[in-house]
Curated annotation (Swiss-Prot):
Compositional bias of kind Basic and acidic residues: 39-52
Ranges annotated as spanning the membrane: none
Complex and partners: Part of the core of STRIPAK complexes composed of PP2A catalytic and scaffolding subunits, the striatins (PP2A regulatory subunits), the striatin-associated proteins MOB4, STRIP1 and STRIP2, PDCD10 and members of the STE20 kinases, such as STK24 and STK26. Interacts with CTTNBP2NL.
Cystine bridges: none
Subcellular location(s) of the protein: Cytoplasm
Region (Disordered) residue spans: 1-58, 331-355, 370-422
Role summary: Plays a role in the regulation of cell morphology and cytoskeletal organization. Required in the control of cell shape. Calmodulin-binding scaffolding protein which is the center of the striatin-interacting phosphatase and kinase (STRIPAK) complexes. STRIPAK complexes have critical roles in protein (de)phosphorylation and are regulators of multiple signaling pathways including Hippo, MAPK, nuclear receptor and cytoskeleton remodeling.
This protein's name: Striatin-interacting proteins 2
Modified residues (Phosphoserine): S328, S339, S364
Species assigned in the record: Mus musculus
UniProt keyword annotations, A-Z: Cytoplasm, Phosphoprotein
Length: 844
């Protein structure tokens, strides 16, 4: 299998936002001949500057949700290079409207019946052979979907009429007509071969596809949006549209699978002209519309737990996070207080050696982590810097993700809330959870200690154990949490053991199930393609000749000639990449969450292919930049955003017009993308010790700690979760040097009562036999997919009658006159015909 996320050679990652890396990575390996003390002093200056800058970062008032505001989601469909086409669409509509409607009324003045008649005429005129005429009619439809902005006075009016027109277009069958046109354009070999011959693909090569995808996206996004004032007819149309997109109709695949096939075709190089940003945005919104967003997912989870007889959920995680407050990273002096009191590095190194000799009991991974690269609280010496550089070079050659400097500035640790905040909220935010496995493990250890033998999975017999153990078991059982996945795994084990007695499983035809069935056999290719595009869109990626070109639908035919035009194009390119990252991160997270709810092994199948395609190091590569700069980047030009650009005259291009407008303290889509990627990384590594070891091997701790500078509660929570799962592997010295981060983990992350996360004594922290864990999981996934989806046409368990007496005793319906000529029939049809017994057995 190809490794799509294999990055380029190690080096300082360039930030497409123009912000640089921001963490001192520009030093390289230079200055090796300088004394250690001046270099260390310069390092501390850099650390102070970075830490002081992060303290000034205000708390970001960000509300996480399925997507951004309606206007923002519509505006991200268009690149600034496409703005001239708004006028073209309007002209095409007005020319057609004047020839077809004899009345002098405008579109908004027509009665609904007249509007429907005109739309029917538009759809009839789409049925022409001429591509040029077809494109003009499609542009007229696009103008309607865009809100007939030529007749509107405000942005609110444009958005209102865009929704109205999209519902009208859907009710007249426009989506189905455009779906047929999309199939034609995908199969258009002439456009593909023309794009392949060109040295540089531009926005002109995808005109037809962009028009079709824009109409479909506007329809999906406008119809998906629910409002209380929507009329009953719109609500009915919404449910019909959702069903139409979710289920395969007329023996065709669900719409999402068509878009997935476009993504793989684009990544294979067969269709470089595909407007991939529009494809990904439409794919994300179709999946969200058909499967449901996060609120719908929570409702499905509650419903499924009730069906399985499980107790209700203690809390809604997203609602709990919304009530949490972000913590400030500690100041430089607090963070390095212990280091400033420490002895000189040379003496410290000597004392380390003597201390190791005195210790008789070590963490399970102390030997594994003898050369700890996370001791950033102490001044780094030249020898330690070279050791850090050697440690980075040990990474897999195809995964040179941590393009770090040998001197990694100490990331500011998380600190507990100040004394005036401790009272709010009272107690810890999460209810503790205990797994059945945890209770069994606790009782096994207790029985071994007190009575000398174990009772397997028996958690009820407490004979011979002291009273405190009884109380502990009672407390553990009070907080026992049984997940839907536990029930599904147990059912799967029973189906594997007793396939005949339990019979065939009844699988409900939910949208998630239908989508998984359609994706199953091409799922590895889909995941690889998405990660390839994500790698190309990451701000830390460098331009390489072998990387895919994701800018085909943003680059103009003629490159800019002035500085201002170049600035505008640079902003457009960065914005284009940010939107791609946003759509892929949200799409992958939605797929994982819905598949996990539908069946745990569907989730594990997608997860394994993401891991095999190097998703974990790719996300770490993404975060190996100045995340604060990425989140606060202003790659947008407000006056050029839809619908503003359709109402106001486009201003003359000046430096002021490029910088005017958006004064928000952060970029919503970039913060949304970062949280999605952290949640994705958390889902891939949770309870998977082999994957957690990947976080350790790729030196993720300093990368993740740098992200704590962003004062946003949800982002900090998922960073702390990822740090928590690997603390047991990082060694005692790392935990000692990062006590403020450990305190933040204790304060904000859910507790497992007997989880030994803060120490290395857990049996799961042993650094061996991780491959067996992944192999066992893969075998279970293959058994699940084979049992449920690889059903032979003739069941292996169908009854076969081999008894001669019963076969001869069967009564056959024969014609009344058959006995008159049965001897002739025997001669012709039996005795004179050669019998192929193999074929006969197969047919019967």
């Amino acid at each position: 299998m190809d490794d799509p996320a294999a990055p380029g050679p190690a080096g300082s990652p360039a930030n497409d936002n123009g912000n640089g890396n921001g963490n001192g990575n520009g030093n390289g390996n230079g200055g090796k001949g300088k004394p250690a003390v001046p270099k260390g002093r310069e390092t501390f200056r850099n650390q102070r500057r970075e830490s002081e800058g992060s303290v000034d970062c205000p708390t970001l008032e960000f509300e996480y949700g399925d997507s951004d505001g309606h206007a923002a989601e519509l505006s991200e469909l268009y690149s600034y290079t496409e703005n001239l086409e708004f006028t073209t669409n309007r002209k095409c509509f007005e020319e057609d409207f004047r020839t077809q409607v004899q009345d002098t009324k405008e579109w908004l003045e027509l009665e609904e019946d007249a509007q429907k008649t005109y739309v029917m005429g538009l759809l009839d005129r789409l049925e022409v052979v001429s591509r040029e005429k077809r494109l003009k009619v499609a542009r007229a439809v696009l103008y309607l979907a865009q809100g007939t902005f030529g007749e509107c006075d405000s942005e609110v009016d444009v958005l209102h009429w865009s929704r109205y027109n999209c519902f009208l277009l859907y009710q007249m069958g426009t989506f189905s007509a455009f779906l047929e046109l999309l199939h034609m354009e995908i199969d258009n070999s002439q456009a593909s071969s023309s794009a392949l011959r060109k040295p540089a693909v531009s926005i002109a090569d995808s005109t037809e596809l962009r028009v079709l995808l824009s109409v479909m996206y506007l329809m999906v996004e406008n119809i998906r949006l629910e409002r209380e004032i929507d009329p009953c007819g719109w609500r009915t149309a919404r449910e019909t549209f959702r069903t139409e997109l979710s289920f395969s109709t007329h023996n065709e695949e669900p719409f999402a699978l068509l878009l997935f096939s476009m993504v793989t075709k684009f990544c294979s190089g067969l269709a470089p002209h595909f407007p991939i940003k529009k494809v990904l945005l439409l794919l994300w919104k179709v999946v969200m519309f058909t499967l449901g967003g996060f609120e719908h997912l929570q409702a499905l989870k509650i419903q499924k737990r009730a069906e399985l007889g499980l107790p209700p959920l203690a809390e809604d995680s997203i609602q709990v996070v919304k009530s949490m407050r972000a913590a400030s990273p500690p100041s430089y002096t607090l963070d390095l207080g212990e280091s400033q009191l420490a002895p000189p590095p040379s003496k410290l190194r000597g004392r380390r050696g003597s201390r190791r000799q005195l210790l008789t009991k070590q963490d399970s991974l102390d030997i594994y982590n003898e050369r700890d690269l996370f001791k950033t609280e102490e001044p780094a010496t030249e020898e330690e810097e070279e050791s850090a550089a050697d440690g980075e070079r040990t990474l897999d050659g195809e995964l040179d993700l941590l393009e770090q400097d040998p001197l990694v500035p100490p990331p500011p640790s998380q600190t507990p809330l100040s004394t005036d905040r401790v009272a709010f909220p009272k107690g810890l935010p999460w209810a503790p959870k205990v797994r059945q496995k945890d209770i069994e493990h606790f009782l096994e250890m207790s029985r071994n200690k007190f009575i000398g033998f174990t009772l397997g999975q028996d958690t009820d017999t407490l004979v011979g154990l002291p009273r405190p153990i009884h109380e502990s078991v009672k407390t553990l059982k009070q907080h026992k949490y049984i997940s839907i996945a536990d029930i599904q795994i147990k059912n799967e084990e029973e189906l594997e053991k007793c396939p005949l007695s339990l019979g065939e499983e009844v699988v409900p035809e939910t949208p998630s199930e239908i989508l998984y069935q359609g994706m199953l056999y091409s799922l590895p290719q889909y995941m690889i393609a998405l990660l390839k595009i994500l790698l190309a869109a990451a701000p830390t990626s460098k331009a390489k000749t072998d990387s895919i070109n994701i800018l085909a639908d943003v680059l103009p035919e003629e490159m800019p000639v002035t500085v201002l035009q170049s600035m505008k194009l640079g902003i457009d390119v960065n914005r284009h990449k940010e939107i791609i990252v946003k759509s892929i991160s949200a799409l992958l997270l939605l797929l994982l969450k819905h598949f996990k709810l539908n069946h745990i092994y569907q989730f594990e199948y997608v997860s394994q292919h993401l891991v095999f395609a190097n998703c974990i190091p790719l996300i770490l590569k993404f975060f190996n930049q100045n995340i604060l700069s990425y989140i606060t980047a202003k790659n947008s030009i407000s006056v050029l955003d839809y619908p503003c650009c359709t109402i106001q005259d486009l201003p003359e291009l000046t430096t002021e017009s490029l910088e005017a407008g958006d004064n928000s303290q952060f970029c919503w889509r970039n913060l949304f993308s970062c949280i999605n990627l952290l949640r994705l990384l958390n889902k891939l590594t949770k309870w998977k010790h082999s994957r957690t070891m990947m976080l350790v091997v790729f030196k993720s701790a300093p990368i993740l700690k740098r992200a704590l500078k962003v004062k946003q509660a949800m982002l900090q929570l998922y960073v702390l979760k990822l740090l928590k799962i690997q603390t047991k592997y990082l060694g005692r010295q790392w935990r000692k040097s990062n006590m403020k981060t450990m305190s933040a983990i204790y304060q904000k992350v859910r507790h497992r009562m007997n989880d030994d996360w803060a120490y290395g004594n857990d049996i799961d922290a042993r650094p061996w036999d991780f491959q067996a864990e992944e192999c066992t999981l893969r075998a279970n996934i293959e058994a699940f997919n084979s049992r449920r989806y690889d059903k032979p046409q003739d069941s292996e368990f169908s009854p076969v009658d081999n008894c001669l007496q019963s076969v001869l005793g069967q009564r056959l319906d024969l014609p009344e006159d058959f006995h008159y000529s049965y001897e002739l029939w025997l001669e012709r049809e039996v005795f004179s015909q050669p019998i192929c017994w193999e074929e006969l057995l197969q047919n019967h």
